[in-house]
């Protein structure tokens, strides 16, 4: 277990809990920035990406060689975040890259590929290498729900008593039909079980969903909100379907464009609002959109920065006089 002099000082902040219902007339959903301020009231916190050099069972042949049809990991690796660099080097360069405020702290974000897909002793060594910096206060681990095991969850549960820990699962859809079509390699039930097991260990848990996957109707998309809202999540991350160059999905679009629905920015804003109306009001919403670099992205092309999109969405929430969880039903 990590032994760091700051652990005792910071540990009290990081105990797992679902966020309280924080949305107000001015902020009609539980935004990530407010959540971080609640968890870390004494300093600003920034994520720094880490590429630990892991792969994915959907690429190395354990499940498949093709990977998910939408996936190109190059689209979210910062320049400093290269697997040829050590964890320490990536961490230190990320700290320098994002340093803006006196006393700023950081979360090491293991983002590329499946960051629980290795022997546990290797995983623990790499997590702890990232944490071995006086200004790194926690880790966020992106992974697949079929790449988790009980001993690792025990380790992370103990670590979460000392540092902030979030496990972010790529759920993508709650429809097994869709998961099969995008070559995800697991069912929604696997996601559900992994989320429940992780939360039971006292670990903050996030679900990542793509809105608008091929051949999903609007009502099926909104049903994702109903299903995911019954799970013990801390947060969710949403983004629009993006068609990325070099992916199997791009090839599918060329051959069967009728399977796809790409929304305009205004259409997606209304879809996202319909979605969060049905989302558990205790969940934090980390984001609504993601923008892959233009050189990779085929569609959609909205010409909006993420903050511009969010401002438009917040304005639309006010116009519709609605908020997160307005139509939520606990089952």
Label the predicted regions:
Residues 98-99, 127-134, 156-164, 196-200:
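Acidic (Asp/Glu)-rich catalytic clusters
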Residues 4, 13-87, 92-107:
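N-terminal [4Fe-4S]-dependent radical SAM core
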Residues 74-91, 98-120, 135-148, 164-190, ...:
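Core AdoMet radical
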